[in-house]
């Protein structure tokens, strides 16, 4: 039984109970959202029996973030990837994808799954291509089915599979500025061009569902034709694929499998709401998992910023999970520090989306930190911040002594120009002179 089938049968699984506590929501609501397909609980039966702490992705839950790690053909090793995993989870990643494309993929993934408390996602075509010697033209559907089953047996919780790219879509990409930017999408496109046949992953969809259902692997329907520049945003190729993903969503549900859908990409700020609403309609409310989106293309080295602007907007309008972008995007393989910066940027984006959507308790931490700020409780401010070490380090750069951790000013304004200290003085004066009736707190 998958989480979806259990929910449809009216059953409440241990994973649903765990999620309900984490989300502070009624367990019956969790069950009903999973049953409807609006929520997924990525929990491969193998991983669920090990280190996994179940979580939920869906419009009724808090907005989640994913961090990508993984080696490449030219850099990184098992130790570095495990350090990235630890950093990502420590700073708040809700899921992690292992996108390794280099050597030792199996060993890296096995160790990541063994040590990860969060769901692990993969793109199976990467390892399959490595085992085919890099020649996608040599692939057949059975190669892919075997790889999906192999990774499912290892405990992978969700898989990005590019079923939506069709042969008849490819001509729609000819005039794009950046063409096909999805690695998986471009590989499938190349295979279709070489063989003049339809997408073999789409043809094998029902067989893939059988594997996903056996291990309760969640579909992450890949957007192989996502725009890779704002010039290509919201074009015919993107939306032609989206229509197919909507059909695949229903087919996946009919087969008893959990489904979420991936989205763009590079989208101007004014088009984000339309994109989210269109996806929700076309894909029947399935959780939307977006990469960014980046809202401008002119800031290599700062794309964690260009993208978290779009991500916050996407989350506010209904995206259920945000895939982080690091400062290294478009430039190179992220290191541990890049992972940290990407996760923090996206925790900010997801949190602001939760506040905007008025999710239960979302603003409590903001209010607590604001009260600590007004009370000049520096240690409490550090504790409540997303990155306490950095917050304290910045304060220590100019006022390192312990005495300044109780001072009623910082180095920005000093003791005479602090507006909050002046406000404190005004309130005290008003009390003494009884100019206004102030409530006691």
Curated annotation (Swiss-Prot):
Which keywords does this chain's UniProt record carry? 4Fe-4S, Iron, Iron-sulfur, Lyase, Metal-binding, S-adenosyl-L-methionine, Thiamine biosynthesis, Zinc
Which pathway is recorded for this entry? Cofactor biosynthesis; thiamine diphosphate biosynthesis
The Gene Ontology CC terms held by the record are:
cytosol
Give the cofactor note text.
Answer: Binds 1 [4Fe-4S] cluster per subunit. The cluster is coordinated with 3 cysteines and an exchangeable S-adenosyl-L-methionine.
Cofactor(s) in the UniProt record: [4Fe-4S] cluster
User: Where is substrate annotated to bind?
Assistant: 68, 97, 126, 162, 182-184, 223-226, 262, 289
Q: Which Gene3D superfamilies match?
A: 6.10.250.620, Radical SAM ThiC family, central domain
Q: List residues binding Zn(2+).
A: 266, 330
An annotated GO BP:
thiamine biosynthetic process
| InterPro entries, A to Z | ThiC, ThiC/Bza_core_dom, ThiC/BzaA/B
Q: What is its EC number?
A: 4.1.99.17
Task: Name the residues that bind [4Fe-4S] cluster.
Answer: 410, 413, 418
Task: Give the family from UniProt.
Answer: Belongs to the ThiC family.
What the entry lists under NCBIfam families is as follows:
PRK09284.1, PRK13352.1, thiC
Looking up HAMAP family in the UniProt record yields: ThiC (MF_00089)
Q: Tell me what this protein is called.
A: Phosphomethylpyrimidine synthase
């Amino acid at each position: 039984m998958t989480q979806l089938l259990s929910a449809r049968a009216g059953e409440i699984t241990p994973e649903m109970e765990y999620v309900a506590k984490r989300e502070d929501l009624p367990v019956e609501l969790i069950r009903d959202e999973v049953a409807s397909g609006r929520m997924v609980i990525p929990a491969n039966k193998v991983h669920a029996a090990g280190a996994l702490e179940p979580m939920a992705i869906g419009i009724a839950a808090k907005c989640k973030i994913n961090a990508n790690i993984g080696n490449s053909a030219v850099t990184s090793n098992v130790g570095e990837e495990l350090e990235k995993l630890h950093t990502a989870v420590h700073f708040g990643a809700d899921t992690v994808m292992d996108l390794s494309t280099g050597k030792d993929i199996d060993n890296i993934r096995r160790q990541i799954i063994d040590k990860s408390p969060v769901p692990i996602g993969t793109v199976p075509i990467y390892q399959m291509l490595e085992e085919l010697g890099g020649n996608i033209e040599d692939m057949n559907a059975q190669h892919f089915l075997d790889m999906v089953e192999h990774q499912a047996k290892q405990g992978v919780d969700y898989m990005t599979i590019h079923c939506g790219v069709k042969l008849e879509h490819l001509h729609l990409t000819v005039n794009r500025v950046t063409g096909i930017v999805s690695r998986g999408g471009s590989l499938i496109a190349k295979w279709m061009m070489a063989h003049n046949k339809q997408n073999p992953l789409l043809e094998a969809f029902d067989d893939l569902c059988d594997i996903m259902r056996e291990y309760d692997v969640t579909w992450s329907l890949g957007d192989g034709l996502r725009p890779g520049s704002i010039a290509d945003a919201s074009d015919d190729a993107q939306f032609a694929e989206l229509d197919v993903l909507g059909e695949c969503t229903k087919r996946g549900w009919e087969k008893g499998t959990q489904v979420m859908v991936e989205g763009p990409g590079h989208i101007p700020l004014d088009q984000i709401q339309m994109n989210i609403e269109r996806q929700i309609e076309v894909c029947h409310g399935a959780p939307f998992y977006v990469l960014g989106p980046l809202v401008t293309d002119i800031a290599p080295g700062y794309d964690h910023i260009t993208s978290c602007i779009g991500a916050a907007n996407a989350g506010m309008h209904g995206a259920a999970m945000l895939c982080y972008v690091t400062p290294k995007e478009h430039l190179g393989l992220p290191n541990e520090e890049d992972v940290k910066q990407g996760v923090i940027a996206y925790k900010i984006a997801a949190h602001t989306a939760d506040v905007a959507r008025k999710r239960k308790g979302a603003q409590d931490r903001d209010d607590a930190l604001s009260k600590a700020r007004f009370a000049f409780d520096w240690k409490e401010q550090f504790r409540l911040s997303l990155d306490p070490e950095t917050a304290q380090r910045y304060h220590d750069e100019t006022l390192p002594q312990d005495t300044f951790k109780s001072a009623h000013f910082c180095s920005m304004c000093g003791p005479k120009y602090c507006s909050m200290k002046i406000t404190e003085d005004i309130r005290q004066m008003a009390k003494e002179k009884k100019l206004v009736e102030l409530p006691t707190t």
